[in-house]
């Protein structure tokens, strides 16, 4: 069963010239987000740009969130990654979805109108409540810190 998520079209080209975000296969975890711009964009090496997707969503359910993740081919082949690494969309956010693209490569990269830029994935959320303690129960891991457990 699929969970309904409210989606607002902010650009009339969505649903006509460009499809609504959708799962490509029954096993897909993410839906592609597209660059819905008025002109092509050229991202220079080292530059970060914020690109509209033409949609807004309202997750509404506090036990869910949406995350925006990079498309693997753009990062690996062209050095195009998300400027914020991962975009977190809280359940109560209702504004436009934007994709921050960073060119970490050495060549300018052109984004055409409608290019697929990133993936939108919905994930479960557990809201925690802190319990103050003076000491933790000891664990095998302890307080070794970053990299303490090694690679083997």
Curated annotation (Swiss-Prot):
Top-level taxonomy: Bacteria, Pseudomonadati, Pseudomonadota, Gammaproteobacteria, Alteromonadales
Record-listed E.C. numbers: 3.6.1.23
MF terms in GO: dUTP diphosphatase activity; magnesium ion binding
Broad class of enzyme this protein falls into: hydrolase
Gene: dut
CDD domains linked to this entry: trimeric_dUTPase
Protein residues bound to substrate: 71-73, 84, 88-90, 98
The protein, known as: Deoxyuridine 5'-triphosphate nucleotidohydrolase
Cited Pfam families: dUTPase
